[in-house]
């Protein structure tokens, strides 16, 4: 009988800024926890061969990470997911097919590690993506759409990302979409000789907060338009120059939209926040940065408003990529090594329970025979403790070489066959040994840096 492998079959589907237009990414974007939960539940209901699943949705990518049941056909899972996406997002399967990138097994693991390490980002080295992945994993885990398999994968991905940051310095310049946007705004400020160094920011989410911090660092005064005054108060406590930032409810947008030359918009709204009906003619030119996906700013009809989207910033990012080529090469070497180490780690996790089961089986057998001997008075009761120690040392000595051999072979491809044979020979799958203590091996500290 063929032995079933216990190694997880990993699978990813990715739609990114490299393969899909901003217009199409807007349709795929999920900005609500309710919508995300419904989407994951749809996958769980209609894709029985998908064991675990999570979704990463950002301004530059929409990705599905999954582990599949043994024997599942990856192309069938891909087609099923594309069909669900097409129905859910009112898109055609053929359009999605043209843009999707599928990875399985080692290439899927390598892809997840690369994304988490910011090597696949529009701005290579930006650190925001790691936090976004942690949030995506946390949500899927807490809603019970993922457990052991994806926890193992993401646990290692976060370690890999930290290693890339620490060993390559790829993130030292602190470049991100928000910083690139502010840098471009600063160039515009100087070229246009704008008199007042002030900016309007709509939103108070993660992206908006990064924009605000970069603007304050460049000595701008910032007016924030948002919905949550309490959130603003908490945010202000983090700032070095809180006096340079003020807050108004977004309901007052009409009062301020025509007063600022520089505007940044980054909210999770699925609709346009800034609409043409709000606009009035001004004597000055205006430069607006829409950093949201879906976009928050309707394409302006006035000639003196210049609008930059996330994709418009790509040419400004190329210089950053070229400057970091050496760090990027080293980072990919780390990711490649981490992918190999991940599978070695996974295989060792499969071996450890077998070793513990063997030792527990030996202990139970020795204890059983000792109790028989005591009951039949083959040995005096006062010798019980010493005999237990002798038996413990004996089965430790007996299992020493098999333990070393198992750990050594855990990193080899034949590990599954060896582990399966031992389980079959010693009937370990049917033993009463409890594996609950091993659950800590799968714990993922997603909240740690």
From Swiss-Prot:
This chain's protein is named Glutamyl-tRNA reductase
Gene assigned in the entry: hemA
Q: EC number(s)?
A: 1.2.1.70
Q: Name the Pfam families on file.
A: GlutR_dimer, GlutR_N, Shikimate_DH
User: Cross-referenced PANTHER family, in alphabetical order?
Assistant: GLUTAMYL-TRNA REDUCTASE 1, CHLOROPLASTIC
Where are the catalytic residues?
59 (nucleophile)
* UniProt-listed CDD domains: NAD_bind_Glutamyl_tRNA_reduct
Set out the biological process GO terms recorded for this chain's protein.
protoporphyrinogen IX biosynthetic process
Q: Which family does it belong to?
A: Belongs to the glutamyl-tRNA reductase family.
Q: Does the keyword Membrane apply?
A: no
Q: How does it assemble?
A: Homodimer.
Site Important for activity — annotated at: 111
- Which species is listed as the source? Helicobacter pylori (strain P12)
State the HAMAP family in the record: Glu_tRNA_reductase
What InterPro entries does the entry give? 4pyrrol_synth_GluRdtase, 4pyrrol_synth_GluRdtase_dimer, 4pyrrol_synth_GluRdtase_N, GluRdtase_CS, GluRdtase_dimer_dom_sf, GluRdtase_N_sf, NAD(P)-bd_dom_sf, Shikm_DH/Glu-tRNA_Rdtase
| Reactions catalysed, as given in the entry | (S)-4-amino-5-oxopentanoate + tRNA(Glu) + NADP(+) = L-glutamyl-tRNA(Glu) + NADPH + H(+)
- Annotated binding of substrate, by residue: 58-61, 121, 126-128, 132
Q: What class of enzyme is it?
A: oxidoreductase
């Amino acid at each position: 009988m063929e032995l079933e492998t216990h190694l997880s079959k990993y699978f990813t589907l990715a739609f990114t800024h490299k393969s899909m237009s901003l217009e199409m990414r807007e349709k795929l974007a999920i900005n609500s926890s309710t919508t995300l939960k419904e989407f994951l539940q749809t996958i769980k209901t209609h894709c029985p061969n998908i064991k675990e699943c999570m979704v990463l949705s950002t301004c530059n990518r929409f990705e599905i990470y999954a582990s599949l049941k043994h024997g599942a056909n990856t192309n069938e899972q891909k087609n099923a997911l594309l069909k669900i996406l097409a129905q859910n997002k009112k898109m055609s399967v053929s359009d999605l097919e043209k843009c999707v990138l599928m990875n399985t097994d080692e290439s899927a693991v390598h892809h997840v590690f690369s994304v988490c390490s910011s090597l696949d980002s529009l701005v290579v080295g930006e650190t925001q993506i790691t936090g976004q992945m942690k949030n995506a994993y946390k949500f899927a885990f807490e809603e019970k759409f993922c457990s052991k398999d994806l926890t193992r994968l993401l646990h290692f991905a976060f370690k890999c990302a930290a290693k890339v940051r620490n060993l390559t310095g790829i993130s030292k310049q602190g470049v991100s979409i928000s910083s690139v946007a502010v840098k471009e705004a600063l160039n515009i400020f100087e070229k246009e000789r704008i008199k007042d160094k002030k900016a309007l920011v709509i939103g108070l989410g993660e992206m908006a907060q990064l924009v605000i911090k970069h603007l304050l660092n460049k000595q701008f005064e910032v007016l924030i338009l948002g919905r949550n005054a309490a959130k603003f108060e908490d945010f202000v406590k983090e700032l070095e120059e809180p006096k340079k930032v003020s807050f108004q409810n977004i309901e007052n947008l009409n009062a301020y939209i025509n007063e600022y030359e520089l505007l940044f918009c980054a909210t999770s709204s699925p609709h346009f926040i800034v609409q043409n009906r709000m606009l009035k003619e001004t004597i000055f030119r205006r430069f607006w940065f829409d950093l949201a996906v879906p976009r928050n700013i309707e394409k302006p009809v006035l000639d003196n408003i210049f609008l930059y989207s996330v994709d418009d910033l790509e040419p400004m990012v190329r210089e950053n990529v070229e400057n970091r080529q050496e760090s990027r090469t080293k980072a990919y070497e780390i990711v490649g090594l981490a992918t190999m180490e991940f599978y070695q780690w996974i295989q060792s996790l499969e071996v450890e329970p077998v070793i513990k089961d063997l030792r527990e089986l030996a202990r139970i057998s020795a204890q059983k025979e000792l109790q028989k001997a005591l009951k039949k008075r083959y040995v005096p009761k006062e010798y019980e403790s010493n005999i237990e120690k002798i038996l413990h040392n004996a089965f430790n000595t007996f299992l020493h070489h098999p333990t070393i051999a198992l750990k050594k072979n855990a990193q080899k491809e034949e590990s599954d066959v060896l582990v399966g044979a031992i389980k079959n020979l010693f009937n370990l799958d049917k033993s009463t040994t409890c594996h609950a203590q091993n659950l800590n091996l799968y714990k993922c500290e997603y909240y740690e840096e």
